[in-house]
Amino acid sequence: RILANLINNVTSLDTLNHELGHCVYDLGISTELPFLDRKASSPAVTEAIAMMMGDIIKIENVLDKIVPDELLERFKMTHKEDEASFVAKSLLIIDFEREIYTNPEQNPAELWQNLSKKYLNRENEQDNEWASIPHYLSHPAYYQNYFRANLMKVQIYNYLKSVLGNITENYKSAEFMDKNIFRYGASIEEYELIKQLTGNEFSASYFCEEL
């Protein structure tokens, strides 16, 4: 069961695919594992799978028969820009949280302004935009998982594509991911799982090469 506020647009389609990514991961975890291992390898890995599923509408042919060619091409071209933007915004959010815990007496609006200039090259007046980030309260210190997941998902997807082709067009994709990723749950540490799956150590180079 998924709780999500959806409307008829691509952002909601991304959201739905993202949450379904979490679902298929959880469903694929072996029930024969010890109870404490019946969860994702790490928050970053389950986010990587979810983010990869969210990206499917831009990196595979899911919408080819639905959206006009010219519009679809422009839509897919936004993917790299979105990826670069996400990295910059993530670094802003993560750095702000670290700095505010290090020195909680400082002015958060001033800190946000300085970091916005550093990471986004954005000059803005001091305000409380930082307070609009729900993760600071709901999931403290969690955003670094999204950042690492954004790197992991590319390495995972590139490997899956090398074996399966477009994963949405290969009926063996679900079985392959169940067998090689999901079923292990938390019995394998996140970086060990990446290496076992792809044959290579976790690296940001795969993400950088995609930009």
Stretch-by-stretch model annotation:
Residues 40-75:
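Post-HExxH zinc-binding segment in Zn-dependent metallohydrolases
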Residues 16, 24, 52, 74, ...:
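C-terminal, non-catalytic "cap/extension" segments appended to globular domains
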Residues 57-61, 79, 91-95, 99:
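Active-site-proximal binding-pocket segments
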Residues 32-38, 63-71, 164-171:
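Short, glycine/acidic-rich hinge or "gate" loops at secondary-structure transitions
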Residues 36-49, 82-85, 140-146:
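Active-site metal-coordination segments of metallo-dependent hydrolases
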Residues 20-33, 57:
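Catalytic Zn2+-binding segment of zinc metalloproteases
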Residues 1-17:
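Short pre-active-site segment immediately N-terminal to the catalytic Zn-binding motif
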